[in-house]
Regions:
Chain B
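A boundary/linker detector
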Residues: 162, 181, 185-216
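Short linker/helix segments within small regulatory modules
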Residues: 253-263
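General detector of N-terminal leader/presequence modules that precede the first folded domain
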Residues: 1-182
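Short Cys/His-rich "knuckle" micro-motifs
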Residues: 248-254, 274-277
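Short Cys/His-rich Zn2+-coordinating modules
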Residues: 217-231, 249-251
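Short metal-binding segments enriched for Cys and/or His
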Residues: 267-283
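Short cysteine-rich clusters marking metal-coordination/redox-active sites
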Residues: 241-245, 266
């Protein structure tokens, strides 16, 4: 009898876990992937998991990728669930990305600029041809040629524009930014909170939204002022010391998108910025984030705000892939109680409708 | 009492529990009002009971006995999974008997056995906002609750009656709590709604993904929305349970073959089992 | 010379859980008196129930106002880590050993966010069930009787004003020795 099949949930779960472990390992005749290999050779997957898992730890992120069989949303979820149990010791000082040790830095708005353009490790000008040489186990590639480090500082492009008064000034605030991992979002959400949500948000969702602003759903005229990738120092001020000490480095990708702004009654026409910052090397995400950040400022800048990317609630409530995947996937949990109610209700409604038709 | 090493009793850290406990007390003080809380990522996915789990984790102690049901049954996989989670992280005894439990965490049902004082019913809630299909903007629904402006819902129900002759909501049927707040009872069948009214047990609702907690204190009026000429009517299959013969309990319809054969069984497995055992006892005597 | 700091909960996890369940039961069934177990020995003038309630609910996120004096403040700061505020209106939790601040001076929440209202813990001299005030409202089947000794004379007048502001309004926890009872903002209190 069908009824018996739903019994024994406990045993079914145990068996499913065992099967999952077997599938994860794959063919035991092949050597097992180490966490270090994932960390080193699937580094962009690790970066994405750190960004969306909102926890900077390459080793844990690599473990999550391995445990999740390469499912990056599942891996981000594992990392989040771990992160949430950690005690909160304090907050860091704001990162100074101006002092970044830059490995890549490009601007689309200036041909050359102080500090120069640094292409760095990028897919951008590769030809997307499958490299069958990689399929064979080979020697490591020869070391990349190193150019002498530029001594010149690398001022931010937005700073250069600001000097000329062309870039809207960002209000400076010493206020402690909100923390959406501790307080639920409330609307209207201020920009620090929005940026926090976007930085944790799903790359694919933000990519689609950013793209929509380029296609007329939101009036965007973006230029990449600058993208930079590199290491920045993390500093904290322990209360017992009273001054900042460095506790380590983070790899981050920052994108500053320059956008037109027509001006308002109180503000002259000028450029405004959209901002993106993500853990690790996550250029696509940083760019998409900066487009969406700018779109979300539409209302405060007095622009029309009708497009999906310009709606705070729409974007912020739906960009978190751990929330989204949970709720979408919960549809596979049993719903037969509700479905039974719907069945009975539908039978009742149809009976009423047919009776009326017959009369 | 053995618990998983490396984690606090009942998984959550004490700071998180305190934050949730403060939210629960305010929820009880304002019956039916949704209190936002700093919901944490749980080791189970959002939508799978994270709100209920956080509420249970914040109230449970070693003196408790926990029952977990999904669709009325103790043996559905998600109920098993959540019960195992608490057995592992809190080491509390669990039970399948409604009458023996001090805390019952549920998804989609209220047990058939009437609950009593001293028991707490914890609902897993996917969408805490009863108005969300009519007004998706949270900032706006917050305003409507502040003004107790529930015209949108009344219009919706009225339109149902105009079109179908009945209110077409069969589960998650909206209720008014203590005459003030419109509340989503979670996706329980409308059949269960009357059990919420003046229930002797405390009812707590946790929505993890939506980050809301709300409550109905004991003996509090919970009224299913209706109209004088179209009173609320809970729906139940017109059949008896094939196992225990109950004509009062809520039934699952089980398809037995591909020729239209079907049977009906109690959705509440504990209730059904108790009734079958009673019949066997009577027969043995 | 300062006294050595009195200890907090011996078992912070389980004692907080025990005290919270008493608070939850008290708030859910207004007028029912809960009795706390445990060996908490807070500094004077704190009584056991009030001290346990504060350790259970207060932390760095809850500004606390109290008139309990320096020893109690030092104890709270150390064991609960809560900020102490001078303005009753700025507090999320208040503990009054003497005359309580008047309810209109306290945070009562807003129509949209009534849950932001403060919780007022009042130390009283005695709490007894089955006699005294007649309480009714959510959490109460018909009526609960509660006798409270040691409240200011105008408490019921202030309470009626507080209740009339629903959904705004403060919630009160009454503590006497190791006993506690609660008055959520919904409860109707009648004399005799």
């Amino acid at each position: 009898m069908a009824y018996v099949a739903v019994k024994g949930g406990e045993r079914a779960i145990e068996h499913a876990h065992a099967w999952l472990a077997e599938e994860r390992r794959g063919d035991p005749a092949l050597p097992e992937l180490t966490v270090a290999q994932v960390e080193q050779q699937m580094s962009l997957a690790v970066d994405r998991v750190m960004a969306e898992g909102a926890c900077f730890d390459r080793g844990l992120a690599a473990l999550a990728v391995k445990q999740a069989r390469g499912d990056l949303i599942e891996a981000a979820f594992l990392l989040r669930a771990y992160r949430t149990t950690l005690p909160r010791f304090g907050a860091s000082m704001p990162l100074d990305t101006g002092a970044m040790r830059v490995r890549r830095r490009i601007s689309a708005t200036y041909k050359d600029l102080p500090g120069g353009q640094v292409l760095g490790p990028t897919f951008d000008y590769t030809h997307r041809l499958l490299d069958f040489a990689l399929a064979a186990e080979g020697e490591p590639p020869p070391p990349a040629p190193e150019s002498p480090a530029e001594a010149a500082a690398m001022p931010r492009v937005t700073g250069i524009l600001a000097q000329e008064g062309l870039m809207a000034a960002e209000p400076h605030s010493e206020a402690e930014p909100g923390d959406l991992t501790r307080e639920p979002l409330a609307f209207p959400a201020d920009r620090p909170l929005r940026l926090q949500a976007l930085a944790r948000g799903d790359e694919g969702f933000l990519l689609g939204l950013g793209y929509s602003t380029q296609r007329g759903y939101g009036n965007a005229h973006p230029f990449v002022g600058e993208i930079r990738l590199g290491e920045v120092a993390v500093e904290i001020v322990p209360p017992e010391l009273g001054f900042a000490i460095e506790i380590g480095d983070l790899t981050v990708t920052e994108c500053q998108m320059v956008n037109q702004f027509a001006g308002s009654r109180t503000e002259p026409p000028q450029f405004t910025r959209g901002y993106g910052l993500v853990f690790g090397h996550g250029e696509r995400k940083a760019m998409a984030m900066s487009l969406v950040d700018r779109a979300l400022r539409a209302a405060e800048l007095g622009e029309d705000a009708e497009a999906p990317a310009q709606s705070q609630e729409f974007v912020l409530y739906h960009c978190d892939n751990v929330e989204a995947t949970g709720f979408v996937e919960h549809l596979k949990l049993p719903h037969y109680v509700d479905f039974q109610s719907e069945l009975e209700k539908l039978r009742q409604l149809r009976a009423t409708a047919m009776q009326e038709a017959a009369e | 009492m053995s618990t998983a090493t490396g984690y606090n009793f009942a998984y959550l850290d004490e700071d998180t529990k305190r934050m949730i406990r403060r939210a629960i007390l305010k929820a009880v003080a304002i019956p039916g009002h949704q209190v936002p809380f700093g919901s944490r990522e749980m080791p189970l996915p959002y939508g799978w009971g994270t709100g209920g789990i956080q509420v249970t984790a914040s109230i449970i102690g070693p003196q408790d006995r926990l029952k977990v049901i999904d669709q009325g049954a103790d043996d559905t996989t998600n109920a098993v999974s959540i019960r195992r989670f608490f057995a592992r992280v809190a080491g509390v005894p669990t039970t399948e008997r409604t009458s023996e439990a001090s805390i019952i965490q549920t998804r989609h049902r209220i047990p058939e056995t009437p609950l009593r004082e001293g028991q707490i019913l914890v609902y897993q809630v996917p969408m805490p906002e009863p108005l969300f299909r009519l007004e998706p903007r949270v900032a706006e629904t917050k305003r409507l609750h502040a003004m107790a402006d529930y015209g949108l819902m009344h219009v919706r129900l009225y339109e149902d009656i105009a079109r179908h002759g009945h209110i077409a909501i069969s589960y998650n049927y909206p209720v008014m709590v203590n005459g003030r707040y419109l509340m989503a009872p979670s996706p329980i069948p409308a059949f269960d709604n009357p059990k919420m009214d003046r229930m002797p047990a405390l009812q707590l609702f946790g929505a993890g993904r939506e980050k809301r907690i709300y409550a109905v204190p004991p003996y509090t009026a919970v009224r299913s929305l209706d109209f004088e000429d179209h009173p609320f009517e809970p729906v139940r299959a017109k059949a008896a349970c094939a196992l225990c013969g109950s004509r009062e309990s809520y039934l699952d319809e089980v398809v037995t073959d591909d020729r239209g054969g079907r049977m009906f069984l109690c959705s509440d497995t504990d209730y059904c089992g108790e009734r079958q055992a009673a019949v066997q006892r009577d027969a043995a005597e | 010379m300062t006294q050595p700091l009195a200890a907090g909960f011996a078992d912070p996890v389980l004692e907080a859980q025990h005290c919270f369940r008493a608070l939850l039961e008290a708030m859910s069934r207004p007028g029912r008196v809960q009795r706390l177990a445990g060996a908490l020995a807070p500094p004077a003038p704190l009584n056991l129930a009030a001290a346990a309630a504060l350790l259970t609910l207060a932390d760095a996120d809850t500004p606390v106002w109290t008139d309990a004096g320096a020893d109690a403040e030092a104890w709270l700061r150390f064991h609960a880590g809560c900020p102490l505020v001078a303005e009753p209106g700025a507090a999320a939790l208040l503990l009054a050993c003497g005359a309580p601040p008047s309810p209109p001076a306290l945070e009562a929440g807003t129509e949209e966010e009534p849950h932001r209202a403060a919780t007022l813990i009042l130390q009283v001299t005695a709490l007894e069930e089955g006699t005294g005030w007649r309480l009714s409202g959510p959490g109460i089947e018909v009526a609960h009787r509660l006798r409270v000794a040691g409240l200011p004379a105008d408490f019921l007048v202030a309470w009626a004003t507080n209740r009339a502001r629903f959904p705004c309004g403060v919630d009160v926890v009454l503590c006497a020795g190791e006993r506690l009872a609660a008055l959520p903002r919904t409860v109707l209190i009648e004399e005799g």
